[in-house]
Regions:
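Functional beta-strand-loop-alpha-helix junction segments that form "active/interaction loops"
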Residues: 244-259
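ATP-dependent helicase/translocase motor core
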Residues: 2-63, 68-219, 224, 228, ...
C-alpha cells in the first residue's frame, strides 16, 4: 500500500472519526504548504516542504500529522513531524503509518505511542488548558476573541506564509497578555507591512482597546521615517473603510489648523509629528519634509527638554492611540537622546510595536533595550533557505568614488599629477 492509499484508506478516516473537518470550527488541512523550496538557479527550486495534515480549530493551527505508507515503520516520520511543528509553532505533532500513531509534545519534550487522535476540543484543551485564575481567564478570552477574526484574504488572493502567521500570533498573544512594548524582527522582503495590516485588522474587528472593554475599535498609528513607507502602508491598509484611514500630512494640518482626530488608522512620519505646531510652514519647509531631511532643530535635544505642546504630536492626548506601529524602528527612534523618543514617551500608554529587519548589534542595542527581545524573528538566511527570498553573492567592485584618475576637463582644487591613481585617503589632501 503506497502513501496516498494509506492516507485515503487509513489515516484520513481516523482523523475524521475524531471530528476533524466535521466539528464546527475545525479544519483538516491536507498537503499544507510550508516553504517554496530554495532557489538554486536556472529557474529551479529545491523540494518545497508540505505537511501531510495540519489540524486547525478556532482559526488556530494546533496539530500536525506526518504520514508514511503502511509498510514503513510508524516512527519513520518523527523527524519531519518535529521539524514541521517547530516551523509552524505547534505544540502537538504526530507520526503515523496508518496502523499506529506516535505523538510528540514539543513543549514538554515528551513523546510516545497514542491509541487515537484527539478530538478538536481535546487537542484545544491540551494546547490551551482552561485557566482557573480570573486574570488568566480574561487573557484567554481575549486570545480567543482576537484569533476568531479571520485573516483579511483580499478575495482569496492572500494567504499568510507560515512565519507571517507565527509573527501575527505572537503579537496578538502578547497584547492579550497585556505586554505593551513589542518587537518583530523579520528580514527585508518578508512582508512586515502585510503582518502589521493583519494585526491591525484583527484588533480592529475584535474591538480591542487599551481599556479591554470591547466597547470600541482601537485607534492605531502607523509611524514611519519616510513618506514613501507611510504611503505604502496607507495603500496596503485599503481593505479598511475609506473613512477609517487617515494620512496625517503637514498640508492637511496647515489647512485645518489642527491635527486630524476622526478616524481609526492613522499614518504619518516622525518629521510631521516633530514639526512645531505654532510655526507657519512655507512651501520650502514642506519640500524639506518631502525630502525627509532629518535636520529639524531639536534633533540633538534630549527628549525631556521638549515641550510637547509645541509640536504636532502634542495636540493628541497621551492615551489617544491604543496601538502604535513603528516601522524601521532601528533607525534611532528609541534612543534616549533622539527627538523621536519624545513621541513614544508622549504616547507611553499605547501598546508600541516596533518593526525592524536588523538583528541586534552594538549600534542598535538601544532599540532592543527599549522594546525588549523580539516576540518573533525570521532571519535572512531562513527566507533564502525557505525560498521566499532570492540568494545573493557579495561582489567587490571599485567605483569612481573609491579611486580617481584626472582627465582633461575635470575641475579640481589643488595640484594634480596627471596619470596618477588617487585613492579615497588622498581626496582631502589634494
Amino acid at each position: 500500500m503506497n502513501e496516498a492509499q494509506t492516507k485515503h484508506d487509513l489515516i484520513e478516516p481516523a482523523l475524521r472519526k475524531a471530528g476533524w473537518g466535521s466539528v464546527k470550527g475545525s479544519r483538516l488541512r491536507l498537503e499544507f504548504p510550508i516553504t517554496k523550496g530554495r532557489l538554486i538557479g536556472q529557474n529551479r527550486r529545491a523540494t518545497p516542504l508540505f505537511a501531510d495534515y495540519v489540524l486547525e480549530y478556532k482559526n488556530r493551527r494546533i496539530g500536525v500529522v506526518e504520514a508514511k505508507k503502511r509498510d514503513l515503520y510508524y516512527t519513520d516520520g518523527v523527524g519531519q513531524a518535529k521539524d514541521y511543528a517547530e516551523r509552524l509553532d505547534i505544540r502537538f505533532t504526530y507520526a503515523t503509518n496508518g496502523l499506529k500513531i506516535y505523538g510528540i509534545d514539543m513543549e514538554e519534550a515528551t513523546e510516545g505511542d497514542v491509541s487515537k487522535y484527539p478530538t478538536p476540543d481535546e487537542l484545544w484543551e491540551m494546547t490551551y488548558p482552561t485557566p482557573k485564575e480570573d486574570y488568566k481567564v480574561e487573557i484567554a478570552d481575549w486570545k480567543e476573541r482576537l484569533f476568531s477574526v479571520p485573516f483579511e484574504g483580499r478575495g482569496g488572493t492572500w494567504q499568510p506564509r507560515y512565519y507571517q502567521q507565527n509573527a501575527i500570533a505572537k503579537v496578538l498573544e502578547a497584547i492579550s497578555e497585556k505586554k505593551d512594548r513589542l518587537l518583530l524582527t523579520l528580514a527585508t522582503g518578508t512582508g512586515k507591512t502585510a503582518i502589521a495590516f493583519q494585526i491591525a485588522w484583527k484588533l480592529f474587528h475584535a474591538k480591542w482597546n487599551l481599556r479591554r472593554d470591547g466597547s470600541r475599535s482601537p485607534r492605531i498609528l502607523f509611524l514611519a521615517d519616510r513618506n514613501i513607507l507611510a504611503d505604502q502602508a496607507f495603500n496596503s491598509f485599503n481593505a479598511f473603510d475609506e473613512d477609517a484611514l487617515v494620512r496625517i500630512s503637514p498640508k492637511e494640518i496647515k489647512k485645518k489648523g489642527k491635527v486630524p482626530k476622526n478616524g481609526s488608522v492613522f499614518f504619518t512620519i516622525f518629521q510631521t509629528f516633530m514639526t512645531n505646531a505654532n510655526q507657519e510652514e512655507d512651501e520650502e519647509d514642506e519640500k524639506d519634509e518631502e525630502n525627509e531631511e532629518e535636520n529639524y532643530s531639536i534633533a540633538a535635544e534630549p527628549a525631556a527638554k521638549y515641550n510637547t505642546d509645541d509640536f504636532n504630536f502634542g495636540q493628541y492626548p497621551k492615551d489617544f492611540f491604543d496601538l502604535i506601529i513603528i516601522d524601521e524602528c532601528h533607525r534611532g527612534g528609541s534612543r534616549d537622546e533622539s527627538s523621536w523618543r519624545a513621541i513614544m514617551e508622549h504616547f507611553s500608554p499605547a501598546v508600541q510595536l516596533g518593526l525592524t529587519a536588523t538583528p541586534k548589534r552594538d549600534i542598535n542595542g538601544d532599540t532592543y533595550d527599549y522594546f525588549g527581545e523580539p516576540v518573533y524573528s525570521y532571519k535572512l538566511k531562513d527566507g533564502i533557505n525557505d525560498g521566499f527570498l532570492t540568494p545573493f553573492k557579495v561582489k567587490e567592485i571599485s567605483t569612481t568614488i573609491d579611486e580617481y584618475v584626472h582627465t582633461s576637463g575635470d575641475e579640481v582644487d589643488g595640484e594634480i599629477e596627471e596619470g596618477k591613481t588617487y585613492s579615497e585617503s588622498d581626496f582631502n589632501r589634494i
